[in-house]
């Protein structure tokens, strides 16, 4: 039976993906959000999904309401109206917990790498069998006939609490979201609770000391580079076109695999996918075939060339992610100067990880910083400024603004890596316009 769904905050990455998936399954879908452009809305518009401004007139008794987690009666007219009228609504994660019960579900959790790993798992599975999926880059695909459902499992505010998947990968555990989690132990406890809800098998990165502490009711399989793991990636051959490696499970050689992505972290993500699909009974020859054709996910090492200048856009907003992105860029462009342009995301994270951010960014050849992007969940109380981070960085560079990205032109034979979870893309677009104008003036 088809339903009509109204999404309150439809441009959110998870919300837009869910909207697309339900639309493709034959349901009527609409949603509301702020007017500001967000990268997820292109897919919604291409699908013909209506995006409305927030208005209580959108809330009627005949629609099923799905509300973004950031919206409350005190900051959203639609939530306030729904509460006043006695209309019920489900939060994104509550809806998802119910929805996945109709499938064999495969989750991907972890502090870092979950979007890329979810995208890789979904890509391989959809090319082998009918699969619905939700990826944290705003991509979703729904099929009424799908037996399998692949989804990204988010730890923030323990949103993964309603999820009970058949299988799950956990890529790592790290201290992040200091506006919610109080300590690394608090983060661990959240993941450990989630792990206990996995039904058939759990796949965790064995070189993460926190993940070695995980307990679960289902069997736990460790993957990694070291021999004490259940699934071991070895004979790694990185190149400027990707990575080649072999995997063994105990004494069994599972084969040689290739991925068109860069950095050791992506080899680990692929090993997790191989381990999960091997235990789930998939043909590894087919898995190997489709690993080769993975095109990546949005805002994860997304490359473009503007007038012979290489520009990379990445969502990295935690020190661990910055290190991985710089590592990947070095693998693909070993002879180029690596210029990092970073926008810190949230004041709480910047304060909590100031030294770690500096250490990570010092891995680049030059570092430019944008002003801190504050979250809607917090206020700037003046405790930290981007200049505090700049003072800890020992590479050439400085501060840039959207209006003036010309300092970035001081580099020859460079690859430019724009990183952040805020509006860092506006800085990237400004630099691209600058490059285009320079070329036009020369001609």
UniProtKB/Swiss-Prot annotation:
List of residues binding ATP: 110-116
EC number(s) given by UniProt: 6.3.2.8
One MF annotation (Gene Ontology) recorded for this entry: UDP-N-acetylmuramate-L-alanine ligase activity
Keywords: ATP-binding, Cell cycle, Cell division, Cell shape, Cell wall biogenesis/degradation, Cytoplasm, Ligase, Nucleotide-binding, Peptidoglycan synthesis
Reactions this protein catalyses: UDP-N-acetyl-alpha-D-muramate + L-alanine + ATP = UDP-N-acetyl-alpha-D-muramoyl-L-alanine + ADP + phosphate + H(+)
Coiled coil (residue ranges): none
GO CC terms of this entry: cytoplasm
Protein family: Belongs to the MurCDEF family.
The name this protein goes by in its record: UDP-N-acetylmuramate--L-alanine ligase
Organism: Streptococcus suis (strain 05ZYH33)
